[in-house]
A protein has these predicted regions:
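Conserved redox-active cysteine motifs that mediate thiol-disulfide chemistry
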Residues: 25-38
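Conserved helix-turn-beta segment immediately C-terminal to the redox Cys motif
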Residues: 20, 35-55
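A short beta-strand-turn-helix
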Residues: 4-20
Length: 127
């Protein structure tokens, strides 16, 4: 599957659907971004069931700002509408494949429970 250009207009709809979305925040002038692009594109071909989206931080400054992107490339993984990974830096192919494997293995019911407990603890501590 080819990568999809993500914009302010389609980001929420495409990345908050069921399934896994890998999102690469990048810019044309960024050397590490250009080095990571073939790794990301090849992974999209190997995993057609996953959305591989790219956000051009130069063209989509509001989107990059909304996600607090301060370093590129930054890779995010969203599973079933929940952000489960966010890290700046380019990954080598083996590390990207391991990340995809780990995202597939997540028990999303458990992730949601943990998030709910964290929010409750934070709310309880703040009171």
């Amino acid at each position: 599957m080819a990568t999809v250009e993500l914009t302010t207009g389609n980001f929420e709809q495409l990345t908050h659907a069921e399934g896994i979305a890998l999102i690469d925040f990048w810019a044309e002038w960024c050397g590490p971004c250009r080095a990571f692009a073939p790794v990301f594109d090849a992974a999209s071909d190997r995993h057609p069931d996953i959305l591989f989206g790219k956000v051009d931080t130069e063209a989509e400054t509001a989107l990059a700002s909304a996600h607090r992107i301060t370093s590129i490339p930054t890779l995010m993984v969203v599973r079933d509408g929940v952000l489960v990974y966010r890290q700046p830096g380019a990954l080598a192919e083996p590390q990207l494949e391991l990340l995809i494997e780990k995202a597939r293995e997540l028990d999303m019911d458990d992730v949601r429970r943990q998030l709910a407990n964290t929010c409750l603890l934070y709310t309880s501590d703040a009171a």
